[in-house]
Curated annotation (Swiss-Prot):
<feature type="binding site">
    <location>
        <position position="46"/>
    </location>
    <ligand>
        <name>NADP(+)</name>
    </ligand>
</feature>
<feature type="binding site">
    <location>
        <position position="302"/>
    </location>
    <ligand>
        <name>FMN</name>
    </ligand>
</feature>
<keyword id="KW-0285">Flavoprotein</keyword>
<dbReference type="InterPro" id="IPR000453">
    <property type="entry name" value="Chorismate_synth"/>
</dbReference>
<dbReference type="GO" id="GO:0010181">
    <property type="term" value="F:FMN binding"/>
</dbReference>
<dbReference type="GO" id="GO:0005829">
    <property type="term" value="C:cytosol"/>
</dbReference>
<dbReference type="GO" id="GO:0004107">
    <property type="term" value="F:chorismate synthase activity"/>
</dbReference>
<comment type="subunit">
    <text>Homotetramer.</text>
</comment>
<dbReference type="Pfam" id="PF01264">
    <property type="entry name" value="Chorismate_synt"/>
</dbReference>
<dbReference type="InterPro" id="IPR020541">
    <property type="entry name" value="Chorismate_synthase_CS"/>
</dbReference>
<protein>
    <recommendedName>
        <fullName>Chorismate synthase</fullName>
        <ecNumber>4.2.3.5</ecNumber>
    </recommendedName>
</protein>
<keyword id="KW-0028">Amino-acid biosynthesis</keyword>
<keyword id="KW-0456">Lyase</keyword>
<feature type="binding site">
    <location>
        <begin position="317"/>
        <end position="321"/>
    </location>
    <ligand>
        <name>FMN</name>
    </ligand>
</feature>
<keyword id="KW-0288">FMN</keyword>
<dbReference type="GO" id="GO:0008652">
    <property type="term" value="P:amino acid biosynthetic process"/>
</dbReference>
<comment type="function">
    <text>This reaction introduces a second double bond into the aromatic ring system.</text>
</comment>
Length: 394
């Protein structure tokens, strides 16, 4: 079983992440993690924080000379801005005199609509939103991306599974139908909004610029693709073992994600059955080989991978920190007020794709190891190859 946890606050000294259950023999380095974290910072519409903050990666355990050992892998992502926040966010008590007059320490008493602020204050009994927003912040996703790097490496090295994400909608701009190839990732990352279609990309940039001019924010839709999944990952036996249920749960756990769909998703609900499902057809050659004529299901049927590309989309809401804040209530007075204005992005949809890749990778790694077992990359690869050779229908 692959398990993972993160710890740390947005303006704390560091984020800490641990993943347990990955086999020995995965080739992954701190440079690989740093490269993935750099991808997370991509995208037109990111805020000023992306220009001066740096993710400093340190591997604490689970690897030796760039190869996993089979034990828990632990990563620290240090916050380069920590010296500015050392007193305000100190884990240990601080003399009140040292905090006096610090603007960063001013209580945040006007919760933002759409954010965790108010519900978090109510739940944990805080009279200040700072403790809530520090942990609820999407900064935490840097730790998930770090762990997802190891999971991606396993999927690629053991099973030949390749992941990529691309932005399919921002505001009213949406790409035409079509899937990018696994080799398109570099070109997608080079695009200012991580969109595979240049014409749509230009409209997305214009949407972001218009929102910024209006002191507003934008959400959008990201699609994640996994190529090379063998059939049979997941199970139909119980709901919590269905792969799509497991993926949906983790993807909905990403900050600001409000919806998940597989394949054609909600569009399928408006179709007749005769044009909603993927017909199965024979493939020429040796053995009883089959394929789906289409991939409307998104590579998952009955909670299991079909062997077709896994295709899942996530909907990200507009960021709730606005430079022209919405109406709220000041919790200290109970009077109407405008919400606090925290430094933020106009649009973080391109970055959301990198985060969703990481979470899909962790879930697929768990499902693959559940299916094939193995304490090393070589063993689980051998088990997968044996399974594929043994399939009566494949």
């Amino acid at each position: 079983m692959v398990r993972w946890l993160t710890a740390g606050e947005s303006h704390g000294p560091a984020l800490v992440a641990t993943v347990e259950g990955l086999p020995a023999g995965i080739r992954v380095t701190s440079d690989d993690i740093a490269a993935e974290l750099a991808r997370r910072r991509l995208g037109h519409g990111r805020g000023a924080r992306m220009s001066f903050e740096r993710d400093v990666v340190e591997l604490l355990g689970g690897l030796r000379h760039g190869v996993s050992l089979g034990g828990p892998i632990s990563v620290v992502v240090r916050n380069s801005e920590w010296p500015k926040w050392e007193r305000v966010m100190s884990p240990d008590p601080v003399d009140p005199a040292a905090l006096a007059g610090l603007g960063r320490n001013a209580p945040l008493t006007r919760p933002r609509p759409g954010h965790a602020d108010l519900a978090g204050m109510q739940k944990y009994g805080f009279d200040d939103a700072r403790p809530v927003l520090e942990r609820a912040s999407a900064r935490e996703t840097a730790a998930r991306v770090a762990l997802g790097t190891a999971a991606k490496a396993l999927l690629r090295q053991a099973y030949g599974i390749e992941l990529l994400s691309h932005v399919v909608a921002i505001g009213a701009a949406e790409v035409p139908p079509g899937l990018p190839a696994p080799t398109s990732l570099a070109a997608i990352d080079a695009n200012p909004v991580r969109c595979a279609d240049q014409a749509t990309s230009e409209r997305m940039v214009a949407e972001i610029d218009a929102a910024q001019a209006d002191s507003d924010t934008l959400g959008g839709i990201v699609e994640v693709l996994a190529y090379g999944c063998p059939p049979g990952l997941g199970s139909y036996v119980h709901g919590d073992r269905r792969l799509d249920a497991r993926l949906a749960g983790e993807l909905m756990g990403i900050q600001a994600i409000k919806g998940v769909e597989f394949g054609d998703g909600f569009t399928t609900a408006r179709r007749r059955g005769s044009v909603a499902h993927d017909e199965i057809e024979p493939v020429g050659g040796v053995g009883r080989r089959v394929r789906r004529a289409t991939d409307r299901a998104g590579g998952v049927e009955g909670g299991m991978t079909t062997g077709e590309p896994l295709r899942v989309r996530v909907a990200m809401k507009p960021i709730s920190s606005l430079t022209r804040p919405l109406s709220t209530v000041d919790v200290t007075t109970g009077e109407a007020a405008v919400a606090i204005n925290q430094r933020s992005d106009v649009c973080a949809v391109p970055a959301a794709g990198v985060v969703t890749e990481a979470m899909v990778a962790l879930v697929l790694a768990d499902a693959a190891l559940e299916k094939f077992g193995g304490d090393s990359v070589e063993e689980t690869r051998r088990n997968c190859e044996g399974y594929l050779k043994s399939l009566v229908i494949h």
